[in-house]
Structure formats: structure tokens, C-alpha cells
Amino acid sequence: MRQSEWLDTVLGLLPGCPKGLPGFWVENEAQASGQALELVLGWHDDCLGLWRPGGKQTPLTVSFCDGKQGYRLTPERVRHERLIKALGKPKDDRIRVLDATAGLGRDAALMAQAGFQVMLAERSPILHAMLADGLQRAPASLVANMQLLACADSKIAEPSALHAVYLDPMFPAREKSAAVKKDLQWLQRLCPYPDEVEEQQLLDWARALGASRVVVKRPVKAGFLAGVTPSFSQKGKAVRFDIYTCP
């Protein structure tokens, strides 16, 4: 079953959603529940959001300046982020970074706030639509350093001008871990995990772009992407950044 067909059994699209998205069009949440759809996409407080039909949880939206994300983007905080340390200092004037698995754009926003010019690539049409909406509401100073590529597109005009390629592929939550966060749980329903072959293809593709380094985000206890040992790593309490330097 293709992903678009599978999403018809999982995701309900409420009136007003962007056209052309995969999913099952419904008139309201009640219809989505009647169709046994797990999630709905629609507008909530002028934001394109994802939530469980009939549920009490706050919809998942792309918002760069609210709550914890807003705190992480403050100038005095962003320079201490482990991701920024993993990116290192650019050579010459190469400050462009390709975030090839943009997701909700949270890490891309950190990189942009740190002064990198970030290109966001996201293959999920649902997440891409949510990113586009979030960027429309983001501060102009942040958006100036962020460029959302066409859905599923990762082509850039001058790959040799890249400082880094950033990868944050989906990773299954540990069965013995505490309740998975809402956003990760819902994203896992929308985006399939890469298998071993896809992991190798993703890493090979990223390294072939000619950037100074490839930075891969992983759970701290997870194995290396595709089993390939990095040049070095930056470890935190929950996540680890594996850095593959390129000649």
C-alpha cells in the first residue's frame, strides 16, 4: 500500500486544508471518528494543526516562538545548544545548511537563529504544509534565514557551497520508555521509519553533496545511522549528534 493510500485510513482532512494533500476528506471531527481515523488536520486558532478527533489534547502546530521553543531561540540560549556546537564554525563564508529531514522545523529554527542560512526539505506533504504555515507566522528576522524547498525536493543550486547537511530521521521509541511525547507519537503515524537500506542511501546521499560535514541526530543510546561510525559525536542526556566530516 502506498503511503498516500495508507494515510486515507489514518488522517482526516477538515474543510479549509490545502488542496492535494493525502488523507480522507471529512466535514467535521465526528465524521472522522465515525471513519475510525486516528488524526485530523485542520485550522485551529488560525494555525494549521494536527490532533485526535474528539480529543482534549492541544493541536500540534508549527510555532517557532511559543513555549519551550521560544526560550530555546533566545540569543543567550541558542549558542549553548548542542546542535549548534555540532555544526561547528563554517569554513570561509559557507554558512548554508541543508536540513534534509525538516519535520516540524524546530532544529532548523535553532540553526537559523544561530546565523546559518537553512534550507528545509521535507518529504511528507502534511508536515510540509504545516511548515509553510508556520513560516508565514514566524518573525521576519528568523524567516530571512530559512528557505522551505518544494515538497520532497532537496536539490540546491550549489551543493559545494554547503557547510553542513543535517539529518534527523525517524527512530522508533523504546518500548520500555515512558509515554511517547504527543508530537513524536503523531509524527510516527505520518512518517515511516527508514529501513537499513534507506538509512544507508540517506547517509550516502548526504555525504556525496560535498558539504564540510554531515550531522545526524540520534537517541543517545541508539546505534549509528546505517551502522556507520562517525568522525566524532556530541552527546547530551537524551540525544546525540554524530558528525561525519567530509574531505
Swiss-Prot record:
It comes from the Bacteria. This is Ribosomal RNA small subunit methyltransferase J. The keyword Protein biosynthesis does not apply. The gene is rsmJ. S-adenosyl-L-methionine binds at R106, D107, E122, R123, D168. GO terms for molecular function: rRNA (guanine-N2-)-methyltransferase activity. One of its GO terms (cellular component) is cytoplasm. Belongs to the methyltransferase superfamily. RsmJ family. Its EC number is 2.1.1.242. It is found in: Cytoplasm. It comes from Alcanivorax borkumensis (strain ATCC 700651 / DSM 11573 / NCIMB 13689 / SK2). It catalyses: guanosine(1516) in 16S rRNA + S-adenosyl-L-methionine = N(2)-methylguanosine(1516) in 16S rRNA + S-adenosyl-L-homocysteine + H(+).
